[in-house]
Amino acid sequence: MKYDLIIIGSGSVGAAAGYYATRAGLNVLMTDAHMPPHQHGSHHGDTRLIRHAYGEGEKYVPLVLRAQMLWDELSRHNEDDPIFVRSGVINLGPADSAFLANVAHSAEQWQLNVEKLDAQGIMARWPEIRVPDNYIGLFETDSGFLRSELAIKTWIQLAKEAGCAQLFNCPVTAIRHDDDGVTIETADGEYQAKKAIVCAGTWVKDLLPELPVQPVRKVFAWYQADGRYSVKNKFPAFTGELPNGDQYYGFPAENDALKIGKHNGGQVIHSADERVPFAEVVSDGSEAFPFLRNVLPGIGCCLYGAACTYDNSPDEDFIIDTLPGHDNTLLITGLSGHGFKFASVLGEIAADFAQDKKSDFDLTPFRLSRFQ
């Protein structure tokens, strides 16, 4: 059997692509080395932020606004346990922060609902937060967080119900191209399709070693908290920049545990074996202490944590492009630790590619040619 589309990697983007392409009427095969959702990539840990006024650059705003529409649509499939929680996101940092300047610029350009607060205003609204006098906060009322594993599970189930073929716990070991399409090699045999999407995450270089993607081991952890830090108490999700430039992110507490991680830093790795579990690197348990001690002093001890991986591009912007020399294969990689919020729209972009539809978005900034 020859498929219209084979998806290599069915985590964040791949699960979305499988659903949207199958819903469009294509004959699709989703593949993954494990059984998604799983603990081997970048999507586990239950929650991910979604921010609209984007500090990483204005080029992302049209994408994230479409992503939000798709997240709202997906959430309607799980109304008892919503995939998107509109908690709001407070972005904290020094008044001269370049990241916050980008957030403010994005908000102005796209007329987004963002409120600027000075240090006293931040601490008056959320007494649990402490910041220096030179800090500001940019509060995104309409943003919040996503339940990442639930989203992937939902997409995979919806795709299956729509007739999508799924080959999980079966790594793809090679990709071949010919005039007739794409062939993948797996332990279960060979499969053919007219087109392929490669969204294999951290270990995409096992298949395509020439790609400029660097795996980095990262950790996040849950710390003892109480009801003051919960969504019910209107405590928001957050990003925070310390005076030394270190960047953190976190979520409202659930079940008396507040999740936080450090965005920058981490350990460069070259194999899955090097992504050791949480606490096997000495700094894991204390990585968030500088932020917690200064900004959230009421948070208690570390309860537990987890390790994940970022697939970093050289400039930490996404790679969305066809494989050089093979216009029938789309790469979506290098998401660099800020990609999950875009998974829905990237999956839709992948489905459009499979249907020979022109994308509604300017993807020029994400081309591989920028590294030449």
Curated annotation (Swiss-Prot):
Superkingdom field: Bacteria
Assembly behavior: Monomer.
UniProtKB keywords: FAD, Flavoprotein, Oxidoreductase
InterPro entries given in the database record: FAD-dep_OxRdtase, FAD/NAD-bd_sf, Me_Trp_Oxase_MTOX, MTOX
Species, as recorded: Escherichia coli O1:K1 / APEC
Keyword Signal (UniProt): no
Cofactor(s) demanded: FAD
Binding of FAD, residues: 4-34
Task performed by this protein: Catalyzes the oxidative demethylation of N-methyl-L-tryptophan.
Protein name per UniProt: N-methyl-L-tryptophan oxidase
NCBIfam families registered for this protein in UniProt: PRK11259.1 (NF008425)
Any one GO CC term of the record: cytosol
Free-text remark on how the cofactor is bound: Binds 1 FAD per subunit.
Family to which the UniProt record says this protein belongs: Belongs to the MSOX/MTOX family. MTOX subfamily.
Keyword Secreted: no
Gene this protein is translated from: solA
Gene3D superfamilies, alphabetized: D-Amino Acid Oxidase, subunit A, domain 2, FAD/NAD(P)-binding domain
